[in-house]
């Protein structure tokens, strides 16, 4: 067993935190004797349903009491009291770099994701574009754990394991899914403009999907500005 208690950091955004779940749940189940602590923001903490018993979720209030350098120092101290002996940074932004600084100062082993920023810049460059397959976020998340000594085979199936979700949770929104019907969720907006698919094209995508028989479209993610 490589470590007894591992801190996992992914503060935002919601979709990126959601993408950690298949990897995190798989690692937790592969190493039941290790406790994993997921550090994320409150809104994202609600994603971790039916979690493995050895996964604990801790909320970071980065816009409140954990804001700024001093706030992050207090956050690092709070987490340190949980007897963390290794850190898996799945975010690699300024906030997590500050946290990593404190953990390294205290002699705690740290592993950080390689986001492949250089490769992505080469792929999206207007000139001298380098066309080559890039590793997925799932692969990059997994590599962080492997670097800490956690070898595992991804075995995540669903948040509901082999079953399905409770239809009663959305009974006020729509009728139960009928046999042969396909449900497609579309979240057209993002916090960063560069991550938003052009709205005119997205409208075309939704329009074409809605014309297919036995397809129901669900739109998600609109804030106040988008609703206007």
What are these regions (language model features)?
Residues 1-228:
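Catalytic machinery of carbohydrate-active enzymes
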């Amino acid at each position: 067993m490589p470590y007894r208690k591992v801190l996992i950091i992914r503060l935002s955004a919601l979709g990126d935190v959601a993408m950690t779940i298949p990897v995190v749940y798989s690692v937790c189940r592969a190493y039941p004797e290790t406790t994993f602590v997921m550090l994320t923001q409150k809104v994202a903490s609600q994603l971790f349903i039916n979690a493995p018993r050895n996964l604990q979720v801790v909320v970071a209030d980065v816009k409140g009491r954990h804001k700024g350098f001093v706030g992050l120092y207090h956050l690092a101290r709070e987490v340190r009291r949980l007897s963390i002996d290794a850190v898996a940074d799945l975010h690699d932004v300024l906030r997590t770099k500050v946290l990593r600084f404190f953990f390294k100062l205290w002699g705690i082993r740290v592993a950080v994701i390689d986001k492949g920023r250089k490769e992505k810049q080469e792929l999206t460059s207007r000139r001298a574009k380098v066309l080559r397959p890039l590793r997925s976020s799932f692969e990059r998340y997994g590599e962080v754990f492997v670097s800490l000594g956690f070898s595992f085979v991804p075995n995540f199936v669903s948040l509901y394991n082999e079953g399905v979700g409770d239809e009663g949770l959305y009974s006020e929104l729509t009728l139960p899914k009928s046999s042969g019907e396909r449900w497609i969720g579309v979240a057209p907006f993002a916090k960063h403009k560069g991550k938003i698919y052009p709205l005119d094209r997205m409208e075309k995508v939704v329009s074409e999907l809605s014309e297919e028989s036995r397809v129901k479209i669900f739109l998600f993610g609109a804030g106040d500005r988008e609703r206007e």
